[in-house]
Curated annotation (Swiss-Prot):
Highest taxon of the lineage: Bacteria
Family per record: Belongs to the pyruvate, phosphate/water dikinase regulatory protein family. PDRP subfamily.
Name the record gives this protein: Putative pyruvate, phosphate dikinase regulatory protein
Coiled coil start-end: none
Binding-site positions, ADP: 157-164
HAMAP family: PDRP
EC number: 2.7.11.32, 2.7.4.27
Organism: Lactobacillus helveticus (strain DPC 4571)
Length: 279
């Protein structure tokens, strides 16, 4: 039976790793973004550290059509069965780990350790990052004002100005971040006025962009999009109120309209004089 067009466009990307598989998954999603019309299914198999587990994976994936295998396996004896399986089944197979290791080996004339998960060794920087992530969750949306005094960065902004995703992104850079949603005529915690203005980032947005984002959010929840929340007059009032607060605080202001989380975060890091806090 001939494949339908949908079946031809379907790709099952198999990700096999002896660690978490995040690197392989990131590479896969970045590459898949080049094929918007393809139906991409991701099937992740992390922590495959022995041949018995690997044999089970290879047996399971045999049932899927249109396979592409992406693997990140440190040890040669784990790589060979995958390569053999792919060759026997005429499957595209990509090793994202070995070429880089080989390039470094050839340049340095050193022998690799073949230590699984070496890039994720539990050093102090790792624990600091976990602590920063926990801090961001604990002090999201102004849950506890004391977090503002302990934070490296405090994000202020009206609803839908990317406060939470920015907090988590910066936390991954080892920064302790707290954020506060701004609503007109609501009390601003006194702690906001007690911290260094340089640590405060005021987030704003274009009214039309904010209107569209909020309307789409209401639609996604199955609600009427034409409410006070998405009303242009209300949005303008919110933004003007926020802008007045930023001026009073003397803080750095960023318009997040048409900016990715990464771009906004880069501006914040530059403002703080941090090149790469995650190093």
């Amino acid at each position: 039976m001939a494949e339908t067009k949908d079946q031809q466009n379907e790709v099952n990307i198999i990700i096999i790793s002896d660690a978490a598989g995040d690197t392989a998954f990131s590479n896969a999603t970045a590459a898949a973004a080049e094929f918007p019309k393809a139906q991409i299914n991701y099937r992740r198999y992390p922590f495959i550290t022995n041949k018995d587990k690997l044999d089970e994976v290879l047996e399971e994936i045999e049932k899927y059509p249109n396979l592409v295998i992406i693997y990140s396996l440190v040890k040669d004896e784990m790589q060979m069965p995958v390569i053999k399986f792919a060759r026997e089944h005429n499957i595209q197979c990509v090793d994202i780990f070995s070429p880089v290791v080989e390039a470094i080996k050839q340049t340095t004339h050193m022998t690799p350790d073949q230590k699984i998960g070496a890039q994720h060794s539990l050093n102090q920087k790792y624990f600091d990052r976990i602590s920063a992530m926990e801090f961001a969750v604990m002090y999201d949306d102004g849950k506890d004002p004391k977090g503002f005094l302990e934070a490296d960065v405090v994000l202020l902004g009206v609803s839908r100005t990317s406060k939470t995703p920015l907090s988590l992104f910066l936390a991954n850079k080892n920064l302790k971040v707290a954020n506060l949603p701004l609503v007109p005529e609501t009390h601003i915690p006194k702690e906001i006025y007690e911290i260094d203005p340089k640590k405060i980032i005021g987030l704003t947005n274009d009214p039309s962009v904010l209107n569209e984002i909020r309307r789409q959010r209401m639609i996604a929840y199955g609600l009427n999009p034409d409410t006070t929340y998405s009303n242009m007059d209300s949005i303008n009032k919110e933004l003007e109120s926020a802008q007045a607060l930023y001026k009073k605080l003397g803080c750095y202001v960023i318009n997040v309209a048409h900016r990715s989380i990464e771009e906004t975060a880069a501006l914040i890091l530059e403002h703080l004089g941090i090149d790469d806090y995650a190093k």
